[in-house]
């Protein structure tokens, strides 16, 4: 039986773990809280209380089995850390994984590694982040590619949508929102899970892939439609011809792995109200 550890059993990591368990994988994972770890044990996921910190570098003996797996998936964002801290912690995780014979590492990065300017950005485009998170992720990607693990995949995710998570919740009723004519770059949770599974099943050296729905309505068009669908106050956008037309190109994974988006159109990501 193949085994995998997911560092970060959160909004993406937990449903991914449950999906892989259904496919017959032996799944381990981590949560910050011992209470949360115990709850996930009851779901059949071997869960360890573990968080990125200086303390983790002492790696207590009861945590070591987390790294005794075939593959390691890291889904933790850098939001709580300085760039230096985050990269040091990821380097430590990768080093521990390599020491214990892990052959495959998958890291969920973000399309924020690209600037908010007009253009089409694919996996070969020059990285030039504008946000601190984006700059940190660029360093993290480089760090993990240099880890020495045989197979390492960087999966850059566009804006995330899924059960009980939709950007319109935060935009509803707001006025004077910028860049109404800019296209959206979004991806559904289910597509994230399916893409990571495809990578897991097909390790093949060092790879970078984007994940983003191939249809890109404007922000004003899409979030107006979403607000109407969910019966929320319609957000008011300022629209200009000069709004940046930033498009994330994400068809390489389709060509290389035969991946097919279940949600190619953001309109299809609108869920029934009971799940919102």
Residue ranges and their predicted role:
Residues 4-8:
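Conserved N-terminal Rossmann-fold NAD(P)-binding element of oxidoreductases
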Residues 13-14:
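N-terminal Rossmann-fold NAD(P) dinucleotide-binding loop
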Residues 46, 50-54, 234, 241-276:
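C-terminal amphipathic/interface module of NAD(P)-dependent oxidoreductases
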Residues 62-106, 139:
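NAD(P)-cofactor binding segment of oxidoreductase domains
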Residues 92-130:
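Conserved Rossmann-fold NAD(P)-dependent oxidoreductase catalytic core, especially the SDR/UDP-sugar
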Residues 141-163:
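Conserved beta-loop-beta element that borders a ligand/cofactor-binding pocket
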Residues 157, 166-169, 177-200:
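Substrate-positioning beta->alpha
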